[in-house]
Structure formats: structure tokens, C-alpha cells
């Protein structure tokens, strides 16, 4: 039996590595990657990413490789069971969310419906 805590949202090694690189470029070690959900996009909800140096009451933080991912409680309810990853490919490089709660997603993967 494993003692590892199961988190409601995964923060992949690739995403943490990229966040660490971007934070070092900004020269502000207090920055964290914040993922959030807003209304909009072609499917009803859309994912957003920003760097933030604040953690608000109720926010969940996930630490990996010395950097943190921050999620507010409202967004977390739509992201449970998902993962924040970073990918580089023909369509460019970007942070992506794999979300098992999404019933459908748009072609670019930045918006979804539940």
C-alpha cells in the first residue's frame, strides 16, 4: 500500500519543469502557476493560466520540482481527476488540461462543456 497522497488534480513533471523555467526568467521566486475556469469559449467554459504571487483563502496548491500550481475552489470542482500538462508540438507549445469531467471540448482544447 502506498503512502502517496492522491491529489484531485495532477501537475505533471513536464508542466512543473516549464513553470520552473518561466519563473526563473521572471526573477520572481514567489510566482506560481494559477489555473482557472471561466465562462466562454466555443464550448461554454474555458481554461485560463496566469502567473500569480498570491495564494487566496481556499486555494489549493500542488508543489512539484519546487514550484506550485494554484487552483481556486470554484475552478477545482470542474477539474477534479484532471491533469495540467505542458506540450510542445506542431501547433506550438502550451499548457494543457486533461479533464475527465468534460463532455465535449473544442478543437483546440481550450474550452469544454460539462
UniProtKB/Swiss-Prot annotation:
GO terms for cellular component: cytosol. PANTHER family: IRON-SULFUR CLUSTER ASSEMBLY 2 HOMOLOG, MITOCHONDRIAL. Signal peptide: none annotated. Transmembrane segments: none annotated. Binds 1 iron-sulfur cluster per subunit. Belongs to the HesB/IscA family. It holds the Pfam family Fe-S_biosyn. It comes from Yersinia pestis. GO terms for molecular function: 2 iron, 2 sulfur cluster binding; 4 iron, 4 sulfur cluster binding; iron ion binding. Required for insertion of 4Fe-4S clusters for at least IspG. It comes from the Bacteria. Homodimer. This is Iron-sulfur cluster insertion protein ErpA. InterPro entries: FeS_biogenesis, FeS_cluster_insertion, FeS_cluster_insertion_CS, FeS_cluster_insertion_RrpA, HesB-like_dom_sf. Its cofactor is iron-sulfur cluster. The gene is erpA. GO terms for biological process: iron-sulfur cluster assembly. Iron-sulfur cluster binds at residues 42, 106, 108. The keyword Iron-sulfur applies. Keywords: Iron, Iron-sulfur, Metal-binding. The keyword Iron-sulfur applies.
Amino acid at each position: 500500500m502506498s503512502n502517496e497522497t492522491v491529489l484531485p488534480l495532477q501537475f505533471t513533471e513536464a508542466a512543473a519543469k516549464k513553470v520552473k523555467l518561466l519563473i526563473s526568467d521572471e526573477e520572481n521566486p514567489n510566482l506560481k502557476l494559477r489555473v482557472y475556469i471561466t465562462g466562454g469559449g466555443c464550448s461554454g467554459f474555458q481554461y485560463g493560466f496566469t502567473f500569480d504571487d498570491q495564494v487566496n483563502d481556499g486555494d489549493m496548491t500542488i508543489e512539484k520540482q519546487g514550484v506550485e500550481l494554484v487552483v481556486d475552489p470554484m475552478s477545482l470542482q470542474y477539474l477534479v481527476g484532471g491533469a495540467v500538462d505542458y506540450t510542445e508540438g506542431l501547433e506550438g507549445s502550451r499548457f494543457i488540461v486533461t479533464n475527465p469531467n468534460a463532455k465535449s471540448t473544442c478543437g483546440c482544447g481550450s474550452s469544454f462543456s460539462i
